[in-house]
């Protein structure tokens, strides 16, 4: 699985399992407590996860996590994790290797940038710490693994760089991408539509086009909406 595919799949997973109540946590090692090798880091994470699962069970919930290691060229080590909500004080008591940074995840439900960071950290560690390889990220087994529906359009002139956004959805403009597929050799055009949680009446659908010269997304049909 290449980087682009890994980011796309991880984005689907994060979007399907986390929301504004979830947390993005970085567990950092103090300099004198850094792991000597990948096996030691994994052992530390396994101990941490046992504590998290026990704490979540006691609170009446089930831990849902995704984590990746980050090891710098000079040995600085961190563990990055997405986790459903857990009490901050409880979490602090589970990590005795240094300090933790906790950031609430936003309520957008769209975590492509976070997925890209996770894959970047993972690839960085594969280069700086011998022994890390294989998986781009690690996760609990209870996560929802979405499988998006795919439709192949074979009609003539169907591929015209036009995106019609149906009522109740909006276009994630940063997701629009056109490139040559590294395996098939065919050109592909991809984008993400996000379900809009805001209730509003729409008379017309938004239509967007990709400007091939500038690479920018242009609105070709203005949306007409009535606010409640």
Each language-model region and where it sits:
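Cys/His-coordinated zinc-finger cores
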Residues: 79-83
């Amino acid at each position: 699985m290449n980087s682009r595919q890994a980011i796309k799949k991880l984005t689907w997973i994060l979007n399907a399992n986390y929301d504004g109540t979830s947390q993005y946590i970085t567990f950092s090692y103090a300099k004198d407590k850094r792991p000597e090798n990948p096996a030691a880091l994994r052992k530390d994470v396994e101990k941490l996860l046992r504590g998290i699962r026990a704490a979540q069970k006691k609170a009446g919930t089930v831990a849902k996590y995704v984590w990746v290691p980050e090891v710098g060229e000079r040995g600085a080590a961190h563990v990055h994790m997405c986790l459903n909500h857990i009490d901050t004080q409880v979490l602090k008591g589970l990590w005795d290797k240094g300090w933790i940074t906790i950031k609430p995840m936003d309520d957008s439900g769209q975590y492509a940038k976070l997925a890209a960071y996770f894959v970047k950290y993972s690839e960085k560690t594969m280069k700086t710490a011998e022994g890390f390889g294989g998986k781009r990220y690690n996760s609990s087994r209870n996560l929802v693994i979405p499988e998006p529906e795919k439709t192949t359009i074979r009609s003539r002139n169907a591929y015209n760089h036009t995106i019609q956004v149906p009522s109740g959805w909006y276009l994630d403009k940063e997701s629009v991408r056109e490139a040559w597929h590294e395996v098939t050799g065919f050109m592909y055009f991809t984008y993400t539509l996000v379900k809009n949680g805001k209730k509003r009446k729409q008379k017309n659908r938004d239509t967007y086009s990709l400007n091939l010269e500038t690479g920018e997304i242009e609105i070709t049909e203005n949306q007409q909406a009535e606010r409640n």
